[in-house]
Amino acid sequence: MQEEIGTTAGAIWQILNAKGELSLPSLKQQVGAKSPIFDWAIGWLAREDKVILTRHQRSYRVRLNDAQARTAGA
């Protein structure tokens, strides 16, 4: 299970790196992972300060932490 969470976290990071900020439902659809794996992967990335979640109306938006985005471009 940990490997699946890590793989999903990697997919999330790659999509956000390529597309920028997305709504949580849109990101989940693009990743194609099911709950709770997707939720655990987002939590892992947030805990590691890799992503930032912001409240937007009735949902959340997620983006890479600016430091992470700079690292990707280096």
Regions found by a protein language model. Name each.
Residues A18-Q30:
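Short acidic, hydrophobic short linear motifs in intrinsically disordered regions
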Residues A33-W44:
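Short amphipathic alpha-helical interaction segments
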Residues N17, G43, R47:
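Residue-level detection of the helix-turn-helix DNA-binding "recognition helix"
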Residues Q2-A9, S23, R55-A74:
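Short, cationic-aromatic polyanion-contact patches
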Residues K28, A41, K50:
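Catalytic cores of transferase enzymes with a strong primary signal for eukaryotic protein kinases
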Residues A9-L16:
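Hydrophobic residues on short alpha-helical segments
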Residues A46-H56:
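A short, conserved structural fragment
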